[in-house]
Amino acid sequence: MSRYRGPRFKKIRRLGALPGLTSKRPRSGSDLRNQSRSGKRSQYRIRLEEKQKLRFHYGLTERQLLRYVRIAGKAKGSTGQVLLQLLEMRLDNILFRLGMASTIPGARQLVNHRHILVNGRLVDIPSYRCKPGDFVTTREKERSRALIQNHMNSSPNEELPKHLTLYSLQYKGLVNQIIDSKWIGLKINELLVVEYYSRQT
């Protein structure tokens, strides 16, 4: 299944706020009205919707998300927590959380168009896994810096998660540590996502 490129508001009206996909928010109470019209949701649908929230927020294909779930399942610790950490440490998401891009698709475009360096080296793979100690910077080109500056000017002044530090004047961000689950930028029940995939196998 390919990456979603359709109407974004349609998705947030059904699934709730997806800040990685769009800065728009569903109207207050719209979720409740949708639920009341559709009646009681089945457990399968609840798990499916949590999975879809994760997929659309991070801008993943179905195959990509399944691969991350399998990697998380083989790691030590809670599969759900490891899954979120893997997704949060993607380069496109790090740029988004730093405020260098207004959405994750926007961050992915910056990476694909070769505007971004990690530790001084050009990286054009949005799924590149960042690690503690990594410096994420913009190329020293006028166009690259203008794009980042535009995003930072338009980004809401939200509190930066503790695992990141932004040096805005230098167009640079630092990954301090692996993210703690309480700083995940999405309201999600990751256990339902893991359950969804465990029941598919």
Swiss-Prot record:
The keyword rRNA-binding applies. Residues 15-43 are annotated as: Disordered. InterPro entries: Ribosomal_uS4, Ribosomal_uS4_bac-type, Ribosomal_uS4_CS, Ribosomal_uS4_N, S4_RNA-bd, S4_RNA-bd_sf. Its main location: plastid. GO terms for molecular function: rRNA binding; structural constituent of ribosome. It is found in: Plastid, Chloroplast. Part of the 30S ribosomal subunit. Contacts protein S5. The interaction surface between S4 and S5 is involved in control of translational fidelity. It comes from Amborella trichopoda. HAMAP family: Ribosomal_uS4_B. Residues 89-150 form the S4 RNA-binding domain. It comes from the Eukaryota. SMART domains: Ribosomal_S4, S4. Keywords: Chloroplast, Plastid, Ribonucleoprotein, Ribosomal protein, RNA-binding, rRNA-binding. This is Small ribosomal subunit protein uS4c. CDD domains: S4.
